[in-house]
Design a protein with these regions (language model features):
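Alpha-helical propensity feature that highlights long, continuous alpha-helices across diverse contexts
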Residues: 1-80
Length: 80
């Protein structure tokens, strides 16, 4: 799964009538799939693309659960 597909899947999941926990679980599953599909032969550009998609997913999570989303974003080193 490339980052564009992941972002589209995340947007679709975000719009489904799921509980907050189910939505967050689905978004984190998409994020995990992206990282599972990377390896030592993944280029720097592809890795940066995956990181940007991850940040997008974490911002969606932040919209559902501020604290959880903020911790994920901080873990990526995107904020102080």
């Amino acid at each position: 799964m490339n980052h564009t597909e992941a972002i589209l899947k995340a947007q679709i999941v975000f719009e489904q009538p799921l509980t907050d926990k189910e939505t967050i679980d689905q978004l984190l599953h998409i994020d995990a799939q992206m990282y599972a599909n990377t390896g030592v032969e993944t280029s720097k550009a592809e890795m940066e693309s995956v990181k940007r998609a991850s940040a997008f997913i974490y911002r969606l999570i932040k919209g559902i659960d501020y604290d959880k989303g903020q911790r994920l974003i901080q873990a990526m080193g995107l904020t102080r």
